[in-house]
């Protein structure tokens, strides 16, 4: 949820959600959100939560209570946590979303070229390393000159590669979202700013369903607010 809070500040649309630390809080959170359905998401500083059982779609209050009880207080094991896992102290309760299409979008430092690169793929919701190994043609890149920044033509190069191409309003939303993600990357001193998946809803809206931000450790001295978000548990 911390990454989504940052996304929201930069105008990146995210689903409505509330954080809960108990079953009772989860129930109260759901009452402030559209639904059912809702989505219960384990909150740990690691990716791959869906495959680890840390993301559950629920269609009733009873299912929400059960999912929250199952997740809270237990270690979540993913590829990024190691075999010991990370204990879950919080869950995020989110509104359900009618998903039409899923994409992967990220800005990361390419160390071989010593510059940022925007990565975009139609294979959203999956580990991008797996996609790159299996279907490299699905992973598109635009390298960014730090002196110039993210340019509109680069966003169009990525978005207009989509087949089928979304509607005009949706295209505008994605183009704007790409620029916003690059601003997150630069202003927050990120080594990674990732949206996975970025979705188009059945209503034609672009939404950042899940996100991850890694901050360059060398920049934490000037990112005191972000340093305070670190979870040492």
Locations of the language-model features?
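A conserved helix-loop-beta module that forms one wall/lid of the active-site cleft
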Residues: 1-37
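Cap/lid and interdomain-hinge subdomains that line or gate substrate/regulatory clefts
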Residues: 127-170
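Short beta-strand elements
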Residues: 42-44, 106-111, 118-122, 197-199, ...
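Glycine-rich phosphate-binding loop of ATP-grasp-fold ATP-dependent ligases
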Residues: 14-17, 40-68, 104, 126-128, ...
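ATP-grasp fold ATP-binding core
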Residues: 1-7, 33-50, 78-99, 105, ...
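Acidic, glycine-rich loop-and-beta core segments that form the ion-binding/anion-interacting portion
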Residues: 202-233
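Hydrophobic alpha-helical hairpins/lids featuring a short glycine-rich hinge
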Residues: 78, 82-144
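A long amphipathic alpha-helix within ATP-dependent nucleotide-binding catalytic cores
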Residues: 154-198
């Amino acid at each position: 949820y911390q990454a989504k809070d940052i996304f929201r500040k930069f105008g990146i649309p995210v689903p409505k959600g509330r954080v809960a630390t108990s079953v009772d809080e989860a129930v109260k959170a759901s009452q402030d959100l559209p639904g059912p359905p809702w989505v219960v998401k384990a909150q740990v500083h690691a990716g791959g939560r869906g495959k680890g059982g840390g993301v559950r779609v629920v269609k009733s209050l009873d299912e929400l209570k059960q999912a929250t009880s199952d997740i809270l207080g237990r270690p979540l094991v993913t590829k990024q946590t190691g075999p010991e896992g990370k204990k879950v102290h919080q869950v995020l309760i989110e509104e359900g979303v009618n998903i039409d299409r899923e994409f992967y979008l990220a800005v990361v430092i390419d160390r071989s070229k010593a510059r940022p690169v925007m990565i975009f793929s139609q294979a959203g919701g999956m580990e991008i390393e797996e996609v790159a190994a299996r279907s490299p043609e699905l992973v598109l890149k635009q390298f960014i000159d730090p002196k110039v920044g993210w340019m509109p033509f680069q966003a169009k190069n990525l978005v207009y590669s989509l087949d089928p191409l979304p509607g005009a309003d949706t295209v505008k939303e994605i183009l704007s979202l790409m620029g916003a993600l690059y601003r997150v990357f630069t202003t927050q001193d990120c080594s990674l700013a990732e949206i996975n998946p970025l979705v188009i809803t059945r209503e034609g809206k672009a939404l950042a369903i899940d996100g991850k931000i890694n901050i360059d450790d060398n920049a934490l001295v000037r990112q005191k607010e972000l340093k305070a978000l670190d979870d040492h548990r």
